[in-house]
């Protein structure tokens, strides 16, 4: 496989982040905890997303060598290029009688976590504290609702 590919490193079971980096790949942090949203089954708080950074992984797979602990790679590793939220809507239909309600719930979960992701990926060193980012989100979300609802 060409090393020109950018890979999403997520579960740290099949291929671990250190092995991908050692093999020369550039990676995007797609850590299960706290970056996955499986509405309404599994998700982590906006504050947990804020406290995460692109050099930390917390897998959920029971056979991961990093289960129940945080894997950290060296800060400023140039081949870790960012992170992402991951929303899996496959549990919505089974958990919401009205599909539109489930989609709306997932949209809110993503929206309130996106600013926390941005603070961690646009700024490798946080520029604002959690309370400030949360307040800014609440202000812009209120404006969005006034416009769209």
Residue ranges and their predicted role:
Residues 1-149:
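Flexible, acidic glycine-rich loops studded with aromatic residues
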């Amino acid at each position: 496989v060409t090393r020109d590919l950018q890979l999403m490193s997520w579960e740290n079971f099949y291929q671990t982040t250190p092995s991908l980096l050692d093999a020369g790949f550039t990676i995007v942090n797609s850590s299960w905890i706290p970056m996955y949203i499986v509405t309404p089954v599994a998700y982590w708080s906006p504050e947990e997303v804020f406290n995460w950074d692109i050099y930390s992984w917390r897998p959920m797979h029971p056979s991961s060598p990093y289960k129940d602990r945080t894997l950290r790679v060296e800060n400023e590793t140039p081949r870790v290029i960012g992170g992402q939220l991951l929303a899996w809507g496959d549990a919505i239909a089974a958990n919401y009688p009205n599909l539109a309600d489930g989609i709306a719930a997932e949209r809110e979960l993503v929206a309130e976590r996106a600013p926390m992701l941005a603070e961690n990926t646009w700024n490798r060193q946080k520029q604002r504290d959690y309370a400030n980012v949360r307040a800014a989100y609440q202000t812009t979300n209120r404006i969005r609702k006034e416009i769209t609802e």
